[in-house]
Amino acid sequence: MDPNSLKTGGLLLPTIERQCASPPSVIVIGGGISGVAAARALSNASFEVTVLESRDRVGGRVHTDYSFGCPIDMGASWLHGVCNENSLAPLIGYLGLKLYRTSGDNSVLYDHDLESYALFDKAGHQVSKETVAKVEETFERILDETVKVRDEQEHDMPLLQAISLVLERHPHLKLQGIDDQVLQWCVCRLEAWFAADADEISLKNWDQEHVLTGGHGLMVNGYYPIIQALAQGLDIRLNQRVTKIARQFNGVTVTTEDGTSYSADACIITVPLGVLKANIIKFEPELPSWKSSAIADLGVGIENKIAMHFDTVFWPNVEVLGMVGPTPKACGYFLNLHKATGNPVLVYMAAGRFAQEVEKLSDKEAVDLVMSHLKKMLPDATEPTKYLVSRWGSDPNSLGSYSCDLVGKPADVSARFAAPVENLYFAGEAASADHSGSVHGAYSSGIAAADECRKRILMQKGIPDLVQVKAYEEMAGVIAPLQICRT
């Protein structure tokens, strides 16, 4: 098959021969991966689609920065589930993007396993691999015991509280000294997965996510090529912050901050959950209580990155550099991009309340803080030549990094959040019940919303639905396999 015959964006859709005066129209609010995926699907189905994006760029919380002279993902950076079942895998294979696998299946640390790491205490002493392996095993046993606590409880509780109960019941699992500091580092990494502190994470829901097989892989080329492919040729209006959405029986009118109005048959809303929770967008009429409560019941986590480019590589050739400490907040984590990409870059990651504190600092203050950690671990560390600091929590276009399972989350909240309200459709990572917080979850959610929107509009207009949606996964025979490495 001629690659040029493939519709850019992973959806091969035949043109619909319309028997109406004008094509059906949809406004997509948000130009992140969910929004551009939805727009791509509808555009390929011969709908008139307008994407309104508040930023001066597409991608949303998928943001690849090139100011270091190499791609640095300051938002999402992993493919969670390096397998053909991942909805993004066929598109990644088609575009020839490389993946660096950082963990296999069932790693207790999620996107990392402890195959390539170096942990240090605050005195700069490296923790032995035997100690780390022993603590990792204990950490797994503690988490297994929290499941028993959950089964005994009628109501939800924080995961940290459950861990405390486990240690009270099983004193032999309590650790001391350097062992306990390594355990705190493991908790720190768990908090990073949820972008929330352990005293906020739901015991009932923390391990209920459907994790795909194949482990986790870094996007070596960054995520932007995927956004670029999906967005190509779409009508995307940048710097258009939506302030009001008015729905009528036969259409919807969207108003932006500068007073511009857009009208269409329907609207797909893909703005981040944090923006919806802040009530920045006014709905007329108001959303029904079941929808507004779903927005309120979902939690939003924060994880920020401090990326630093150096002239020389002075650190060990391992994937992860970590500093252990007496509490999770006192621990530190550096991702070594030189190992995965060959670029002399370290990325420090901060999650939960610590990520909020980082946002209050200037870029220089944030870099100085993490460099003080790095110099305790590696006294010969040099100063970075360039640096980048993300602030997803205070960014008015995101107001958070991704959704998370807070204590007391209702079982049906994801379904309610994703459900349409008349001609308003909702998509994004928070709308993905099985894969929230992931890029492929956001992508699949956008495709699903577009599919539902298309079918309903065509039915309302009495137009035959001639479209058979074909995602790239249905074309596996003509798509290159994933390029995966780990050295």
Swiss-Prot record:
Query: In which tissues has expression of this protein been reported?
Result: Widely expressed.
The keyword Acetylation appears for this protein:
no
Q: Which reaction does it catalyse?
A: spermine + O2 + H2O = 3-aminopropanal + spermidine + H2O2; norspermine + O2 + H2O = norspermidine + 3-aminopropanal + H2O2; thermospermine + O2 + H2O = 3-aminopropanal + spermidine + H2O2
Q: Which GO terms describe its biological process?
A: spermine catabolic process; thermospermine catabolic process
Pathway where it operates: Amine and polyamine degradation; spermine degradation
Q: What is its EC number?
A: 1.5.3.-
Entry's Gene Ontology molecular function annotations: flavin adenine dinucleotide binding; spermine oxidase activity; thermospermine oxidase activity
Q: Tell me how the cofactor is bound.
A: Binds 1 FAD per subunit.
* One GO CC annotation: peroxisome
Q: Does the keyword Oxidoreductase apply?
A: yes
Names of the cofactor(s): FAD
UniProt KW keywords: FAD, Flavoprotein, Oxidoreductase, Peroxisome
Origin superkingdom: Eukaryota
What InterPro entries does this protein map onto? Amino_oxidase, FAD/NAD-bd_sf, Flavin_amine_oxidase, Flavin_monoamine_oxidase
Q: Where on this chain is Microbody targeting signal (motif)?
A: 485-487
Residues that bind FAD: 53, 61, 242, 429
**Where does the record say this protein resides?**
Peroxisome
State a single Pfam family of this protein: Amino_oxidase
The UniProt function text for this chain reads: Flavoenzyme involved in polyamine back-conversion. Catalyzes the oxidation of the secondary amino group of polyamines, such as spermine. Substrate preference is spermine > thermospermine > norspermine. No activity detected when putrescine, spermidine or N(1)-acetylspermidine are used as substrates. Plays an important role in the regulation of polyamine intracellular concentration.
In which family does this protein belong, per the annotation?
Belongs to the flavin monoamine oxidase family.
| Protein's name in the database | Polyamine oxidase 4
Organism of origin: Oryza sativa subsp. japonica (Rice)
Q: Tell me the classification of the organism that encodes this protein.
A: Eukaryota, Viridiplantae, Streptophyta, Embryophyta, Tracheophyta
Q: Give the gene name.
A: PAO4
